């Protein structure tokens, strides 16, 4: 009986640690990768947080999302929005260093990799 408990516990711990993380190839060259972990899409952009925030605001409008909340500080920002099917979208922007900013997108409660990536692509296009 104790072997089953130990084995079950180890299995649950392994699933919690390794189960929710995927590296997603971002481009066809294989040089850039994004991370989709526990329903959250993460990718770096080569610019500052304020410029990324402006690009994210524009992407929210382009994707016809209803913005419910936004806040911006010097090195970080957050935008909350809703889709037409009432799914909650959260965009977190954090400046990693003076030349790179981390963008984290969660689409819905469980996360949607395809829709999150589409929104990130719009943000990235607005930065160019």
Model-assigned labels for residue ranges:
Residues 12-13:
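Repetitive helical segments and hydrophobic/amphipathic motifs
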Residues 22-128:
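Ser/Thr-rich, low-complexity intrinsically disordered terminal regions
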Residues 1-9:
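Bacterial N-terminal signal peptides that target proteins for export
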Residues 16-20:
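C-terminal motif of bacterial Sec signal peptides marking the signal peptidase cleavage site
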């Amino acid at each position: 009986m104790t072997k089953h408990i130990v084995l079950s516990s180890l299995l649950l711990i392994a699933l919690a640690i390794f189960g929710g993380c995927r590296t997603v190839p971002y481009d066809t060259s294989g040089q850039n990768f994004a991370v989709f972990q526990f329903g959250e899409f993460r990718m770096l952009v080569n610019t500052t947080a304020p410029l990324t925030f402006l690009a994210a605001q524009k992407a929210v409008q382009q994707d016809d999302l209803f913005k419910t909340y936004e806040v911006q500080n010097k090195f970080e920002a957050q935008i909350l929005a809703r889709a037409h099917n009432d799914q909650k979208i959260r965009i977190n922007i954090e400046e990693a260093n003076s030349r790179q900013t981390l963008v984290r997108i969660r689409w819905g409660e469980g996360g949607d990799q395809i829709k999150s990536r589409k929104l990130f692509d719009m943000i990235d296009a607005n930065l160019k």
